[in-house]
């Protein structure tokens, strides 16, 4: 469909969905409609099947989770045209409507900003009238947790906290790549995986110049994880989103623009509320690391060991061909994670992990100046707060093995005095902020995150 026709689309709808219990395959249909006709899409999500048939209670609960997933996953297709009308397929309660509204507005805020589409920030779904049937309900208490794994340090910390405390987690991922599979192997735990197949038509439209941009993919993957958990009779889905995920990148048109919105605490609360209201699930989903800073998580990861040869937080690395290429060493995530880990690892160890020393490369200075708030705004990437970067730099400046590194010495001279004063009183190693983590799980994390006694020097 030509782009000029896409731009005239005035509504996005959800014609139907189906689920085959024998294959675990869900088909989600979507449509953009307008004066020139319609553009249809079908997404296919395949869930791993349980060893024995699920109970009627689980099947009913799964159906309610899939109803939410159908609507939330549509955000990938809505963005090709960004029509002013979002027409939901069935009545929903207020908590579910709040989730949908936020996913299509706050979750698409960066997309709206980059494409100059302020109307997206004010989008309100059209909800059919009618009563919502109360959910059957499903109790996840005492069941084996599903621990989401992305291949980075954060999910490894969560997985190890649960495992070491006897909670017997199952690693989970959507469309696992070689990086995630390597982490699963290193953990020694059996893993579950779901598959998400985006309609190829979407890629064709994108290649032809359709509107495109960042989507709240964590919201989609979270619901896929919850659906997997219910189908397989498992317990809560444990995520590894830290507190800095709630920190916006900038303000535009009176709205916060946050690259990580769907990883933030607001999105977590909305998703939990919708799952309780619509599917009858209590405590089905939470982030174990919510109250920790990125720097706190990095310190904990450095003390775990066993994953140095497989860990990566670099998005570009997922596209690299070489088996040893886990870090591109030239993106905001590589820069930040290197900076966050460096104070807690000997230089030789972190250089081996990354395949190079970013703090010895003067070409990295412009990117590090952004991370430290010296130039520009916080990058549109999953990186920590400016304060955390300054604290990490201050720790490096105190260590003989790091203080003379070219990038470290140059950055120390560039950071303003006010930032140093803030770093001196920083609480980055003090857990804080809102959290939905149940006490049993919070205790498991606490046993792993006790302060380190010695730093490499």
Swiss-Prot record:
Q: Give the catalysed reaction(s), semicolon-separated.
A: UDP-N-acetyl-alpha-D-muramoyl-L-alanyl-L-glutamate + ATP + H2O = UDP-N-acetyl-alpha-D-muramoyl-L-alanyl-D-glutamate + AMP + diphosphate + H(+)
Example GO molecular function: racemase and epimerase activity, acting on amino acids and derivatives
Q: What is the lineage of its organism?
A: Bacteria, Bacillati, Actinomycetota, Actinomycetes, Micromonosporales
HAMAP family (UniProt xref): MurL (MF_02209)
Major enzyme class:
isomerase
Q: Which gene encodes it?
A: murL
The biological pathway it contributes to is: Cell wall biogenesis; peptidoglycan biosynthesis
> Could you identify this protein by its name?
UDP-N-acetyl-alpha-D-muramoyl-L-alanyl-L-glutamate epimerase
Q: Which GO terms describe its cellular component?
A: cytoplasm
InterPro entries registered for this protein in UniProt: MurL (IPR043689)
Q: What does this protein do?
A: Cell wall formation. Catalyzes epimerization of the terminal L-glutamate in UDP-N-acetyl-alpha-D-muramoyl-L-alanyl-L-glutamate.
What GO biological process, any one, is recorded here? cell wall organization
What is the disulfide pattern of this chain? none
List the EC numbers from the record.
5.1.1.23
UniProt family annotation: Belongs to the MurL family.
Keywords for the protein's UniProt record, in alphabetical order? Cell cycle, Cell division, Cell shape, Cell wall biogenesis/degradation, Isomerase, Peptidoglycan synthesis
Q: Which organism is it from?
A: Salinispora tropica (strain ATCC BAA-916 / DSM 44818 / JCM 13857 / NBRC 105044 / CNB-440)
